[in-house]
UniProtKB/Swiss-Prot annotation:
<dbReference type="GO" id="GO:0010476">
    <property type="term" value="P:gibberellin mediated signaling pathway"/>
</dbReference>
<dbReference type="InterPro" id="IPR055900">
    <property type="entry name" value="DUF7477"/>
</dbReference>
<feature type="binding site">
    <location>
        <begin position="153"/>
        <end position="161"/>
    </location>
    <ligand>
        <name>ATP</name>
    </ligand>
</feature>
<dbReference type="GO" id="GO:0005634">
    <property type="term" value="C:nucleus"/>
</dbReference>
<protein>
    <recommendedName>
        <fullName>Casein kinase 1-like protein HD16</fullName>
        <ecNumber>2.7.11.1</ecNumber>
    </recommendedName>
</protein>
<feature type="compositionally biased region" description="Low complexity">
    <location>
        <begin position="24"/>
        <end position="37"/>
    </location>
</feature>
<dbReference type="GO" id="GO:0005737">
    <property type="term" value="C:cytoplasm"/>
</dbReference>
<dbReference type="InterPro" id="IPR017441">
    <property type="entry name" value="Protein_kinase_ATP_BS"/>
</dbReference>
<dbReference type="GO" id="GO:0048586">
    <property type="term" value="P:regulation of long-day photoperiodism, flowering"/>
</dbReference>
<keyword id="KW-0067">ATP-binding</keyword>
<dbReference type="InterPro" id="IPR008271">
    <property type="entry name" value="Ser/Thr_kinase_AS"/>
</dbReference>
<keyword id="KW-0939">Gibberellin signaling pathway</keyword>
<dbReference type="GO" id="GO:0106310">
    <property type="term" value="F:protein serine kinase activity"/>
</dbReference>
<dbReference type="Pfam" id="PF24289">
    <property type="entry name" value="DUF7477"/>
</dbReference>
<feature type="domain" description="Protein kinase">
    <location>
        <begin position="147"/>
        <end position="425"/>
    </location>
</feature>
<dbReference type="GO" id="GO:0006897">
    <property type="term" value="P:endocytosis"/>
</dbReference>
<keyword id="KW-0963">Cytoplasm</keyword>
Amino acid sequence: MPELRGGVWRARLRSKKVYDVQDADPAASPVSPAPRGRTGRRGGAAAGRGNKTVAEGGGRKALKPRGKGCRAVDLCKDQPCKDLPEVIARKAVTGKAQEDLGLNKVADRAANLMMDGESGDKFAAAEDESTTTPVPERVQVGNSPEYITDRKLGKGGFGQVYVGRRVSGGGSRTGPDAQEVALKFEHRSSKGCNYGPPYEWQVYHTLNGCYGIPSVHYKGRLGDYYILVMDMLGPSLWDVWNSVGQAMSAHMVACIAVEAISILEKLHSKGFVHGDVKPENFLLGHPGSVDEKKLFLIDLGLASRWKEASSGQHVDYDQRPDVFRGTIRYASVHAHLGRTGSRRDDLESLAYTLIFLIRGRLPWQGYQGDNKSFLVCKKKMATSPELLCCFCPAPFKHFLEMVTNMKFDEEPNYPKLISLFDGLIEGPASRPIRIDGALKVGQKRGRMVVNLDDDEQPKKKVRLGSPATQWISVYNARRPMKQRYHYNVADSRLHQHIEKGNEDGLYISCVSSSANFWALIMDAGTGFCSQVYELSQVFLHKDWIMEQWEKNYYITAIAGATNGSSLVVMSKGTPYTQQSYKVSESFPYKWINKKWKEGFHVTSMATAGNRWGVVMSRNAGYSHQVVELDFLYPSEGIHRRWETGYRITSTAATPDQAAFILSIPKRKPMDETQETLRTSSFPSNHVKEKWSKNLYIASICYGRTVC
């Protein structure tokens, strides 16, 4: 029964793991021969020939889209995606399905520029540099002095920076009266200027006077450009790293660490996260000035709020896997996966920055191609802190462990993070970087002793460097009913089990595969009145599926095996009125988002090796859906979705990733209880226990759960 909490009814939601993990080693699994095409009762099809075109069947007038779906911001290229056919069916009224060779192909066009190179690797909401409008030779904005535009200092995702020399007057090195300033130009056609001045202006205005953030003295528009007049600064940490032989001492990097943490603490206290922490965005003060050893954090073009300005509450969690903001080399894993930015992400990027400055290289450098972000994220998840920091002093490993284990809305313990590096920092005379901010944080600690081991409960590590795969089973509360499972089913025995279940009034509700053997869940609560299935040597046999669509069957369960074969189950008695599916070499989030906008919802998913198959249907009974995609079981994301009313309705996993579709049903069930379980073997020992609590398997898959 639901529990009453805080004045509202909340369902019982549990995620349980059985700690009998086995290593992921698909190559060691027994491989059965690729099956010949087989058709279950009431079906009928030849062996599959593979999907070579996109096809659409004629049918009834499409329903109006239901649900608002998720709005995707097309900021960067997809994860690796070799698009395979999309197939759409409409329930036939007359005639055969007509092929449309044009055919709803999804154009996955990247909207960013990629700044490729060992120091950049940046995907961002970048401006279109196709404009050839020269920057003004002379600049005067607002009540500023007049400046002559001199040499170019650099170019980023949101603009370009030049030296500005004052035409007359000015005698100081910094401040509004400086002889030299930095002029940042952003073209009015830049994506950041669609609605007027750049968003960065608003951030600088809010952060005015914030420790470690350079001052903006004047701003305004001149011709086609929005212009910021800022303090001139010195070399970046990237420049310094290059000048000292591409390796910094642990002492120097420790000084950088504590001061950078202090700067981020001040920035975060204003409600913002930076979003692009890296060596190129940390600059020292102007050479010869009093600030030449002071650290500054620049480029707020990707800054975002972690705290709502009006309410002061933490922003809501979300994940949009097609959105990436930052620089690939230093971005947090959560940024790669499209999760809403929060304070933990800046700190994870700082950890990679510090390790890079000491080691001179990160293990994920060198990847190229459209799937670069995917490969880098996969490598980050697979690299344990022990391995990544094997040539670094222990404090850097401890720092990385702490920040990569933080929750989405967790407040960082900045004093504790700074205190990690106390033993590496020498006296004031030998410090290459001023650590004024860190010292102030230390003064706040006062006489308190920060115990690094005992002041809080130890957290479970999320990145072990030992990938593993498991069964993931999802259980929903139902009225008592008959349910049956079969696992380790060979191709030759599949028909026998299904026939026996049909004779007992059971229909297939979900299917899965592991090591080229099948798992079947059959129950009496599907509501189906007829069912057909096909075991094919290809992954989702288009011709057979379209043939069944013509007979008013709809896909209700799919599974794929490592050897590329698939099991497709189609049923009558569903509420669906239209259906579409896609096979892709990567998780097809952009296609899913497109279909959401057309009123479809995900109703089945499967994988075959590293290929994904996703089925979407109209009139599925959901008002909204979201995706949780990760290189491990996304426990935090699932629990956050549960708390906001979502329930898991589809699951699938490859040896690399696990994906979960969570939905809000239009009709709220009497009992919303949902539980998940992860086991190294099929959960036969646990299912009966669940049945005794009226919890029944709703979805099951086998794949990556641990990194």
